[in-house]
Regions:
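Acidic-histidine catalytic/liganding microenvironments
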Residues: 4, 17, 215, 262-263
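Glycine-centered loop/turn positions within well-structured domains
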Residues: 8, 81, 168, 188-190, ...
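Conserved AMP-binding/adenylation subdomain of ANL enzymes
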Residues: 8-25, 32-112, 121, 146
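Short hydrophobic/charged patches on amphipathic alpha-helices used for structural packing
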Residues: 62, 111-114, 209, 256
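Gly/Ser/Thr-rich phosphate-binding loop
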Residues: 71-74, 83-168, 181, 266
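C-terminal boundary motif of the adenylate-forming
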Residues: 223, 262-279
């Protein structure tokens, strides 16, 4: 459950952090009931006054993106990978890499690619919901687009962490948003306190109690570590880590992340031998 306060305070926080203006544009394409859409697409739009465009359908998404020409665009690694795959269908990776190394052609090629994607007006590009490969961040940087990775969950309105321009460190999800505090428990769990933290789970006081520590910090269930300037690195889920037959602990996410770099792989699940796993 969220209140008006847990919606509005994060809205003001991200507006201040990103310097969002009333001439900014954004494309809404998630279900309107999604917590991120409620925060960014609804409350933050009303608070900041920027333009919000709506995608007509999945089939028209690319045209909708070109119609909106967003200045703010946040998506998931899977979509950023699809954009890259679409570019590679028209221009092989080796050829693109050669063209980007030619000073006279570099700017022209970058502009052409971003315009075709509908991303040529972007001044803030973000990625979240899953780890994004460092190689993909570097690829977009080569096009002049700095992808800022973020981190959050429904329980804190997705208002948790965001990389800062010029301070992106591959493998890290950035620093806390304004007024968000972070700590690592003795068990290695990331715990958070901030204005977006939920009131609790609807009609489920037992689960609500489990979600918070005795002193009021939100338990994320994620393992992590913090560097010297406060950037958070997620090292896996507390419950997903498994042990091999040789006694070695394995965290699946980094392995899955590497597999997804392959152009022919869309989804990847890593599990231990003999473990139950769902496959589609």
């Amino acid at each position: 459950m969220h209140s008006f306060a847990t919606l509005s305070r994060p809205a003001r926080g991200i507006i201040a952090l990103l310097g969002i203006r009333d001439d900014d544009r954004m494309l809404s394409y998630l279900p309107l009931a999604h917590v991120f859409e409620r925060w960014i697409g609804e409350v933050t739009t009303l608070t900041g006054g920027y333009q919000l465009f709506f995608a007509e359908s999945l089939e028209t998404f690319q045209q909708d993106l070109q119609r909106a020409r967003p200045t703010l665009f946040i998506s998931v690694p899977r979509l950023w990978l699809k954009f890259q795959a679409g570019v590679y269908k028209k221009m092989p990776p080796a050829k693109l890499a050669r063209l980007l190394k030619i000073p006279l052609l570099n700017r022209i090629v970058r502009k052409k690619i971003l315009t075709a994607l509908g991303l040529d007006q972007i001044r803030f590009a973000g990625s979240g919901s899953a780890p994004i490969p460092a190689e993909l961040i570097a690829w977009y940087r080569g096009l002049g687009l700095e992808l800022l990775e973020g981190y959050g969950m429904t329980e804190n309105l997705c208002y948790s962490h965001l990389s800062r321009p010029g301070q992106v460190r591959p493998g890290y999800v950035g620093q806390p948003y304004p007024d968000v505090q972070q700590r690592i428990s003795p068990e290695g769990e990331v715990q958070l306190r901030g204005p977006g933290n939920m009131l609790g789970y609807y009609k489920n006081p037992e689960l609500t109690q489990e979600a918070f520590t005795e002193d009021g910090w939100l338990r994320t269930g994620d393992r992590g570590e913090i560097d010297e300037i406060g950037r958070l690195k997620l090292t896996g889920r507390l419950k997903e880590q498994f042990k091999t037959s040789k006694g070695k602990y394995v965290v699946p996410a980094p392995i899955e992340n590497k597999l997804l770099l392959h152009q022919e792989i869309e989804q990847a699940v890593v599990s231990g031998s003999g473990m139950e796993a769902a496959y589609a």
